[in-house]
C-alpha cells in the first residue's frame, strides 16, 4: 500500500491523479484475487483496464450488505494462512458480517488511526484513554490502540463504561485525551458531580468521539454536542465517522467543518436512489471503495449512511472531500404522517427534553400499511402533562407527534444493552415483522 498523508494538502488535480492511480491498482488486485469481483466483472463484460477514473466506476454495479451476507467467502482475497485477525460488523441493519484481516490490513488500520489522531491535533506527547472495548470482535477498539501506538502516544486501555474506574485512571495517570462514545461523557460528568470531582480541571483536553453524531449539517453542534460543550467547555470534541466495512476512519480537524476523507485509503461517492451522483451540498448515500485493503477489499459498497459531501478546501489546508455527520441510515428512514424522519433527528429531540432518562424508539407497520412510531421513555415522571410536553416538543421540531409510552428506567436500560450487544440500542425496527 502506498501511503501519502501529504496528498491531502495537494491541489485538486494532484489528488485526483493520485486516487486514479490507486484505483487502477485496486481494480487489478480485485480482478486477480477476489472471486466475487472477478465474477462481477465477467458478468458485466468489463475488464480491469476499462476502469481508470472514479467516473468509470459508474459502469459497475454497487456492492450491498446482502451481497456480503450471501457470499462472505467469495470476498476474501487471500489464503487462510495470511489471515491474522477476524472482526464482525455490529449488525445494525441485519446479521453481522465477518471480516478477515491480514498483517497488511492491521498496518493500514494503524496508519489510518495515527493520521486521524494527528488530524484531531494529537501528538506523541499525548496520553490517550481508550474508553471503548477492544474485544468482542470489535475492529475499532483495536484500530484505536494500534493507531495510538503508531503515533507513539501513551495508551490506557480502560474499556467502556464504569465511570468510577475512568475517573480513577484519569486521577492516577493524567491522560490528555480520550476515545469515547460521546453520550458517555455526560455520564462521566454526572458521576463527577455526584462525587465532588472537579472534572473541568482534569487533565483531559480533547475527546475523539465515536459512534454518535455531534454536528448538524451546518457543522454546528447538535443537541448532544451542545450539551457536552455546555457541561465541559474545556474539553474539545472531535467528530469521527467509520465502519468495519470501510476499514477507515474519517475525522474532523480543529476547524470542525466535516470529516476529512483520507485520499490514500478510500474513495467516496455520494449517490441517490438510482445510483447517480448527487450535487454538492445534497444528501446522498455514502458508497465506498477501499484502497490498500488486502484481506476483504470492497468496491462501490453501499454503506446505508446518508451524508452531505463538501469539496471546498478546508481552512486547515486539506483539499480532500469532507463529509458531514451521518444524517441517518437509508434502511432506517421513516415515513410518518407524510414526514420523512431518520432516528438521529428523534434522538436529538429526546436528548434535549429534561426528565427523559433513557429511551427506545420503535417503528412498526400499522393496520393501514403505514409507518408508526412508539417512543418508549424511561423517566421518573409518568404523568399526562409530561406526555403532552414531549408530544408538543416533537410537533414543534418535526411537525408530528409519535405515541408515548412510559417505562421504568431500568427496563429501558436493559433493552438498550442486550447481553450479546456491544452497541447501545436506541432504535428498534419492527416493520418487517408487522407488515
Outline where the language-model segments fall.
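Conserved AMP-binding/adenylate-forming
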Residues: 219-313
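Generic structural signal for residues in well-ordered beta-strands
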Residues: 155, 237, 268, 359-361, ...
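Nucleotide 5′-phosphate-binding alpha/beta core
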Residues: 1-88, 94-111, 115-119, 124, ...
